[in-house]
Amino acid sequence: APGSYLYYDGRNAPYNRLTGLHGGFAVMPQGSSNRVYSGSPTFVQQYFWVFNECDPAWNNAVRNRQTPSGRYTPRYFTINGLSGRPPGAPGAMDPAIDSMADPRTKLDGHLGDRTLIRCLNAGLAKHSVHTHGNHMEWLTSNGQVRPAVWEKDIVPLDGNGGGADVIYPFDPVPDAWPPMTNTTLRQAENEGRHSAYPMHLH
């Protein structure tokens, strides 16, 4: 069936999955390259955001070929295997370690570049996926087509294999002054003023 899927190593569950033996793949509707499911809103580009987290005590136990016995307490959170770095911190904007600079993760587009984000959760923790600068169109939840497409700025992502498909529309903010257009964004960049859609997770 068309949709977004998490693949993972099911042996030694959930430890192998939590330590990185996972990924995402897409099944496109037959005859379509710009829809999540037949009749869905369209998109022009797509990304996978595969979420995970790390409990150092659990990872250390698995590394030593032991079964973790303590309570699961994640301390580090990742998208596509990378963590985020605050501006100015060591590694900030290094695409090898900072998810906000990684071209597989960082949303990049112009006004109207409707972008599908396939959110999948390999970890156990629940997340609230939140972007700034736009609402997202929430299409699916845990592999099920939602009865109506909602515009949301926060989309829940269940733990332990949860998923959500959303479209980030790259629409201009309606009350922005001066009004945002591709022309005004290009002019700002020509003047040395970088314009970007900020994003972080909660």
Listing of model-derived features with the role each one plays in the protein:
Residues 1-202:
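Copper-binding active sites and cupredoxin-like electron-transfer domains
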